[in-house]
UniProtKB/Swiss-Prot annotation:
Residues 1-42 are annotated as: Disordered. Keywords: Cell membrane, Membrane, Transmembrane, Transmembrane helix. This is CASP-like protein 4B2. Residues 82-99, 160-174 are extracellular. The lineage of its organism: Eukaryota, Viridiplantae, Streptophyta, Embryophyta, Tracheophyta. The keyword Protease does not apply. It comes from the Eukaryota. It comes from Oryza sativa subsp. japonica. Disulfide bonds: none annotated.
Amino acid sequence: MAMVPADADAAAKPPPDVEKPDYSSQNGAPNSAAAAAGGGGGGVVDSVVARWRREDMLDKSPLALHAAAAAFAFVALVLVASNQHGDWMEFDRYQEYRYLLAIAALAFAYSLAQALRHALRMRRGVDPVPTASGRLLDFASDQVVAYLLMSALSAATPITNRMRSAVINRFTDTTAAAISMAFLAFVSLALSAIVSGYKLSKQTYM
């Protein structure tokens, strides 16, 4: 009886599986470390872009807010000055409305000057007022004019409410509209003061 050699039996058996090396990184497929690095880079870029947008908005907001305040104050000024309809319906008969007229004129002149200043700064890239002094000026003067507007509103609103409780006519309607416009001017300057305060807090002196 023929004997099968042991070497022949070993040759007949299939070879064991050999673990194949991973060539995915060499073939261009990103590994986990590269993917993580890519994701981190995208987050950094997004944060930088978001910061640029925020700084751009903060840079343009003083012009927009002061222009809005000037427009609202001008409308309030015109409404009060033209509110003359004879007899008791004359704005200059009431010191509250005279005060409102004076403060509206002041707010219009101040806001217009500030809007022109910021427009010049954005157009030429140079602020007529030095940066440190300009931010302090914006923060302080915005608050002062906003406070004066609020004091004028506090004086004019009660007498207007008393008049409207007795009679509603062109005079009282015009006065109420002027008060509304002055209030919007106050809101614009208050927001501008907040922006100026934020810029002032971020200012470096080194």
